[in-house]
């Protein structure tokens, strides 16, 4: 009996040690302040994830010559409210970059485009899908997937990503010696995707689900589970970690995990999986944060 108790205590001690190490990793990686606030810094580039998850995605990038949204996946009212937390308004936007036509990326697009006459940037297939889905004609500024163009002092590099939309894209924004990569909604990472974001200083990458939580979820039909797990679905926590390991360089300084499923993932789980991988590959220079659905992240000023 004593031997059994000693063995149990030993296993408990090991478990506590492992948990303590993981907690330490998470604390080290999550260096951002806890609350969003007004943009007051004089540095040239600001990034605010206004919200990210299965119910809506929207990010804000500000430079001296551009104020851009990447997707508009919340209602126009919600986007206005979230911009207000950082002292900004939709009226001052330079344009909106659209990754693809799914509703969690375009919910507020019609009202923003109609009322404010904002430029909408997307490719031809996405533009056609927008007209059909929103039941209204939206004038879009078209680009060819794989091409580059400029908005003020921002060079926008586009590239194809594998997702079940018409012609989904990722973005790499280059401005003022800063490179910001956006990788959400993709079922796997191709060599092209990895090549395009390898030079990023900031990476927003989806960690949509934990595979076991998804498989066990009683509210998801099997057909939906197959779609999410497929090669044109969404990245799991482990798949996101694999991708980051592939592209890791000393240039990558900040990372946001986005598009987390409320039912099939947990922020602390996604963060722990990525933090452990960063620790394993010696990437202690990367500050890791998890984007939330309901509140903006603190602004990152670069």
Residues of each region from the PLM?
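C-terminal regulatory/interaction regions
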Residues: 2-7, 22-30, 37, 268-302
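Conserved beta-strand hairpin/beta-sheet module of binuclear metal-dependent hydrolase folds
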Residues: 7, 23-25, 29, 34-86, ...
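Structured catalytic core of nucleotide-sugar glycosyltransferases
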Residues: 48-58, 100-109, 127, 158
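Active-site environment of divalent metal-dependent phosphoester hydrolases
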Residues: 55, 103-106, 127-129, 165-166, ...
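Active-site neighborhood of phospho(di)ester-bond hydrolases with catalytic His/Asp-centered motifs
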Residues: 70-73, 93-101, 121-124, 181-184, ...
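Active-site metal-binding motif and surrounding structural segment of the metallo-beta-lactamase
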Residues: 77-122
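Metallo-beta-lactamase
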Residues: 123-178
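Cap/insert and terminal regions of metallo-dependent hydrolase folds
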Residues: 191-292
């Amino acid at each position: 009996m004593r031997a059994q108790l000693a063995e149990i205590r030993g296993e408990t001690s090991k478990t506590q040690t492992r948990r303590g190490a993981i907690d330490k990793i998470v604390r080290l990686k999550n260096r951002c302040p806890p609350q969003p606030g007004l943009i007051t810094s004089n540095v040239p580039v600001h990034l605010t994830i206004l919200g990210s998850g299965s119910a809506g995605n929207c990010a804000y990038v500000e430079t001296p010559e551009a104020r851009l949204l990447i997707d508009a996946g919340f209602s126009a009212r919600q986007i206005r409210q979230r911009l207000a937390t950082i002292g900004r308004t939709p009226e001052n936007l330079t344009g909106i970059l659209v990754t693809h036509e799914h509703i969690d990326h375009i919910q507020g697009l019609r009202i923003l485009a109609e009322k404010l006459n904002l430029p909408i940037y997307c490719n031809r297939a996405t533009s056609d899908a927008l007209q059909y889905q929103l039941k209204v004609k939206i004038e879009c500024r078209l680009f060819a997937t794989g091409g580059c163009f400029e908005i003020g002092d921002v060079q926008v590099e586009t590239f194809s990503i594998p997702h079940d939309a018409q012609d989904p894209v990722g973005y790499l924004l280059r401005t003022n010696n800063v490179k910001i990569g956006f990788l959400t909604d993709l079922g796997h990472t191709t060599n092209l995707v990895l090549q395009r974001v390898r030079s990023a200083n900031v990476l927003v990458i989806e960690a949509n689900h934990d595979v076991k939580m998804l498989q066990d979820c009683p509210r998801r039909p099997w057909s939906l589970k197959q779609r999410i797990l497929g090669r044109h679905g969404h990245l799991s926590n482990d798949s996101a970690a694999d991708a980051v390991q592939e592209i890791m360089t000393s240039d990558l300084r900040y990372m946001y995990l986005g598009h987390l499923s409320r039912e099939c993932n947990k922020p602390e789980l996604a963060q722990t999986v990525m933090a452990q991988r960063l620790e394993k590959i010696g990437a202690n220079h990367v500050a890791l944060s998890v984007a939330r659905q309901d509140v903006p992240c603190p602004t990152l000023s670069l």
